[in-house]
């Protein structure tokens, strides 16, 4: 009975962890009106980008380590850019909006996971 309960707990944790990893970003290139298209980023793209060059607006999934002007300019093949990268779901709505703090959200999920695992491990001891 105890082994079965442990297995169910591990299965539940695996499901919860896998659903919390995927980042969602707005994904539009120069929308005519407000961007409403969003997509789930692949695991190697861990940030959302909003970049503005003149009237051109780019909103897409991005790699946070590549979030610098030099890389963005070369990748998007543009001459100048204002940009912002953020790491929370749908945080790249527009350039003017303040981003949500994805780091706090990630820290909270990690703390919850660690607490749950420790509780499951220590429960048989008490």
Curated annotation (Swiss-Prot):
Task: List each copy of the UPAR/Ly6 domain by range.
Answer: 23-110
Q: Which GO terms describe its molecular function?
A: complement binding
Instruction: Offer one example of a GO biological process linked to this entry.
Output: negative regulation of apoptotic process
Gene Ontology cellular component terms for the protein in this record: cell surface; compact myelin; external side of plasma membrane; extracellular space; plasma membrane; sarcolemma
The set of disulfide-linked cysteines is 25-48, 28-35, 41-61, 67-85, 86-91
- Write down the glycosylated positions: 38
Where is the signal peptide, in residue numbers?
Answer: 1-22
* UniProt-annotated location(s): Cell membrane; Secreted
Q: How is it modified after translation?
A: N- and O-glycosylated.
**Pfam family membership, one:** CD59
User: Which SMART domains does the record match to this protein?
Assistant: LU (SM00134)
Q: Which keywords appear in this protein's UniProt record, sorted alphabetically?
A: Cell membrane, Disulfide bond, Glycoprotein, GPI-anchor, Lipoprotein, Membrane, Secreted, Signal
The membrane topology noted for this protein in its Swiss-Prot or TrEMBL record is: Lipid-anchor; GPI-anchor
Q: Where is the lipid attached (GPI-anchor amidated asparagine)?
A: 101
Propeptide segment residues: 102-126
Which PROSITE patterns does the record cross-reference, listed alphabetically? LY6_UPAR
Its quaternary organisation is: Interacts with T-cell surface antigen CD2.
Protein name, per record? CD59 glycoprotein
Q: Which organism is it from?
A: Rattus norvegicus (Rat)
Q: What is the lineage of its organism?
A: Eukaryota, Metazoa, Chordata, Craniata, Vertebrata
